[in-house]
Amino acid sequence: MLTHPAALLGIPLYILDSGSHTPAKQTLLAPANTSHPDGPFTSESHIRELAKQCDILTVEIEHVNADVLESVESEGLCEVQPSPATIRLIQDKYLQKKFLDERGIPVAPYEGIGEKTEDGIKKIAEKLGLPVMLKARTLAYDGRGNSPLQSTSSSDIQKSLDFLGDRPLYAEGWCPFVKEVAVMVVRNKEGEVRSYDAVETVHKDSILRVCTAPLRAKGMEGVNERARELAEKAVGHLQGAGIFGVEMFLMADGESPCIL
């Protein structure tokens, strides 16, 4: 997503990823007489080597090494955008939801899960109601790391816990949405934000299949404006510059989009 605009603007990029045939590396050549670094984007040594070559270090996805990015920034090796604090927040979906909730951003009902026991899950299900979605706090992406719980039977609870593995979890109340909506928001270092028009995202098997623009919401006038306003407000509370994808559910009344 960075390489095409960078090529059009004549901005040289160094891309850190494992292998020489990753999509970004195939799309944009490294600056003259150099090559893209080869290695995992969670590796401290590779990140530090990349930082020495760059004026600004940014990320395409949040599943990176935030600790190293903080060190790179504090040591002055290069500028890091968005702020490592923002990346760390986005990495933990529960902390992200709590952060937005505390700042008045509408989110789905949620509860943290401490001990992953049958009794603990039952209490949370009683509070949020069934069905309830059990979610991994970290390394979750595009439906991965989610397990819907339809009942509080021992077998169903254990099946969900086994599926989600050893990662920390939280629970989210069920949202009977009618559309999934996304807004791209641009934020600069001074905190100014601008957004693009909202789009509808259609998923199948937890994978985005179709993205429709402009957003079509028959009988729900003003949804685009409300979605953009909500997305800009959410991103306005973050730190650092970047382009952020804000996903939300559109509820049946058309009046209450909530951040995912």
Regions found by a protein language model. Give the residues of each.
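CheY-like receiver
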Residues: 49-50, 99, 123-124, 159-163, ...
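Short glycine-rich anion-binding loops that position phosphate/pyrophosphate groups of nucleotides
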Residues: 62-64, 137-139, 186
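Internal nucleotide-binding/catalytic subdomain
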Residues: 149-254
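A short beta-strand motif that forms the metal-chelation/ATP-contact edge
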Residues: 255-260
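Short catalytic-loop micro-motif centered on adjacent basic/acidic residues
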Residues: 56-59, 82, 108-111, 170-172
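A conserved helix-loop-beta module that forms one wall/lid of the active-site cleft
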Residues: 75-78, 82-150
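ATP-binding N-terminal substructure of ATP-dependent carboxylate-amine bond-forming enzymes
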Residues: 1-98, 116-119
